[in-house]
Amino acid sequence: MRVYLNGEYLEQARAAVSVDDRGFLFGDGVYEVTRARNGRLFEAGRHLRRLERGLEALGIAPPPGFEPGGGALLEIADRLLRDNGLMNGDALVYLEITRGVAERTHHFPPAGTPPTVFLRTNRLAAPDDVRERGATVITTPDLRWERCDLKTVQLLPNVLAKQQAVTAGAFEAVFVRAGIVTEGASTNVFVVIDGAIHTHPATQRILPGITREIVLELAAERGLRVVEQAVPLEELRGASELFLTSTSTEVMPVARLDGGAVGSGRPGPVARQLHAALRERL
């Protein structure tokens, strides 16, 4: 499998990032994961706009020609998909930009330090078996920082929450902060209450997921009522449906929450409808 690293296309085994890279030392960088179907990137513009916002917030200037709207990143992604035989079916493109290689200091390195740019691709195997029966999820305290809206590579709290889910035999861990449901370790969370779809508003408490954004549009197009407001944990437990969204999981209905059934204990009609609509959009 070939990857791109700082101007070079090379075999993954030959790709090496410096031990002084700030992404390695501090988690000082941002990333994006974009879906490709039959070689076509899905909603690449939205992903690149979110990347640009993250770079600006962190004060990382991409190399000349690599501005998110400049096209170079799309050209690299296209070449990797072709080189790796991923022009048919579903694939993922992973992109990471860090603040680059510099002496280890907590403050920013000198102006002009080249950022590290890395892209890779891989085949996507959607978890359709889990979707068919409905996922099992657990809740866990949300102990993350206050800028969850930035897609940074510093994901340790998410890693710990995901491992907690795996240990419990669950698909996902859902964060709860001060009694309010925020999002999943790697997903956004939607809840159906009294026929209306509820999801946490796009504040600094959650990542503004691209699939989340699209699902909100699909719901509105179908006349479904959507409420973007905080959902207390107690309401989550009494919801008729609960589902998750992300680039790789698409729309994932939840059948069990913390050991108890969600609604009927089977994938619900709203989640099924929105997943079918998303598949049509893909």
Listing of model-derived features with the role each one plays in the protein:
Residues 176, 180-202, 208:
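Glycine- and Gly-Pro-enriched alpha-helical subdomains that act as flexible
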Residues 209-214:
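Feature captures the catalytic cores and cofactor-binding loops of soluble hydro-lyases/lyases
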Residues 1-173, 178, 203, 217-282:
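Conserved alpha/beta cores of soluble small-molecule-handling proteins
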